[in-house]
């Protein structure tokens, strides 16, 4: 039982550290407007945050 608890705690700590190191792109996930403006700046119609936990900026096709 102790082994399972220790493994669970280590997995939780590892996941927490990994989540903190993720670099979100172009304002995602907290500033979808920044993603939209980025997409407009590269001559797309706009964009939105998508993917796991909305970490990726996706631009609309023309």
Swiss-Prot record:
Task: Give the superkingdom in one word.
Answer: Eukaryota
Keywords (alphabetical) are: Antibiotic, Antimicrobial, Calcium-activated potassium channel impairing toxin, Defensin, Disulfide bond, Immunity, Innate immunity, Ion channel impairing toxin, Potassium channel impairing toxin, Secreted, Signal, Toxin, Voltage-gated potassium channel impairing toxin
Location in or out of the cell: Secreted
InterPro entries xref list: Defensin_invertebrate/fungal, Scorpion_toxin-like_sf
* Keyword Signal annotated: yes
GO BP terms, alphabetized: defense response to bacterium; innate immune response
Presence of keyword Chaperone: no
What GO molecular function annotations does the UniProt record carry, in alphabetical order?
potassium channel regulator activity; toxin activity
Location, primary (coarse class) = secreted
Q: Name one GO cellular component term.
A: extracellular region
Which positions make up the signal peptide? 1-24
Disulfide bridge map: 28-49, 35-57, 39-59
Pfam families, A to Z = Defensin_2
Tissue and organ distribution: Low expression in both venom and non-venom glands (hemolymph).
The Swiss-Prot or TrEMBL record describes its family as follows: Belongs to the invertebrate defensin family. Type 2 subfamily.
Protein's job? Antibacterial peptide active against Gram-positive bacteria (including S.aureus ATCC25923 (MIC=2.5 uM), M.luteus AB93113 (MIC=2.5 uM), and the antibiotic-resistant S.epidermidis PRSE P1389 (MIC=1.25 uM)), but not against Gram-negative bacteria (including E.coli and P.aeruginosa). Also blocks the currents of Kv1.1/KCNA1 (57% inhibition), Kv1.2/KCNA2 (27.5% inhibition), Kv1.3/KCNA3 (IC(50)=23.4 nM, 84.3% inhibition), KCa3.1/KCNN4/IK (15% inhibition), KCa2.3/KCNN3/SK3 (87.5% inhibition) and Kv11.1/KCNH2/ERG1 (30.4% inhibition) channels (tested at 1 uM).
Q: What's the name of the protein?
A: Defensin BmKDfsin3
Naturally occurring in which organism (per UniProt): Olivierus martensii (Manchurian scorpion)
């Amino acid at each position: 039982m102790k082994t399972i608890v220790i493994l669970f705690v280590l997995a939780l700590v590892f996941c927490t550290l990994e989540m903190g190191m993720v670099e979100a792109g172009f304002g995602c996930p907290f500033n979808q407007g920044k993603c939209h403006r980025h997409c407009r700046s590269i001559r797309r119609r706009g964009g939105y945050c998508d993917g796991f936990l909305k970490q990726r900026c996706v631009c609309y096709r023309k």
